[in-house]
């Protein structure tokens, strides 16, 4: 058994190549080999969001605070709130972030394939 204590891993500001606005990433866990899963708590300030991206093995978001938006390519922008769970299928192009006037925090869970968990694309 291994316990990861809250606050033992430093917060990191989301890189401007991958995010618009201010985003904070708090690593939660990265399972040891041979497991592939990892997770982070991500906080988006009002209006902040990800660039378009995909995940080779999909992604689960669990909204924990605030109000946000998520959109898949070709779909409508969907409002997401605390308690909502969002699943993006492997290779599904999408973005997610805070609503224009409200911050949003979610836990993001994804798995590595060939050493990567995400493929970043264009920003809007």
Would you name each region that the model predicts?
Residues 24, 38-55, 90:
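Conserved short histidine dyad/triad with adjacent acidic residue
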Residues 50-52, 70-71, 88, 93-100:
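Short beta-strand His + acidic residue motifs that chelate non-heme Fe in jelly-roll/DSBH
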Residues 74-90:
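Short acidic-glycine-tyrosine-enriched beta hairpin
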Residues 41-45, 54-70, 109-111:
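Short, conserved beta-strand element in jelly-roll/cupin
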Residues 1-37, 117-124:
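A short, N-terminal "cap"/entry segment at the start of jelly-roll beta-barrel domains
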Residues 77-79, 97-102:
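Beta-rich strand-turn-strand
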Residues 60, 87, 101-120:
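A short hydrophobic beta-strand segment most commonly corresponding to one strand
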């Amino acid at each position: 058994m291994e316990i990861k204590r809250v606050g033992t891993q430093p917060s990191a500001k989301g890189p401007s190549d991958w995010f618009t606005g201010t985003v904070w990433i708090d690593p939660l866990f990265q399972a040891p080999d041979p497991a592939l899963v990892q997770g982070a708590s991500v906080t988006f300030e009002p209006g902040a969001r990800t660039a378009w991206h995909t995940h080779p093995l999909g992604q689960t978001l669990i909204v924990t605070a605030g109000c946000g938006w998520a959109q898949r390519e070709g779909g409508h922008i969907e409002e997401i709130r605390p308690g909502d769970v969002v699943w993006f299928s492997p290779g599904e192009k999408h973005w997610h972030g805070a609503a224009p006037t409200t911050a949003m925090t979610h836990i993001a869970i994804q798995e590595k394939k060939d050493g990567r968990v995400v493929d970043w694309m264009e920003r809007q």
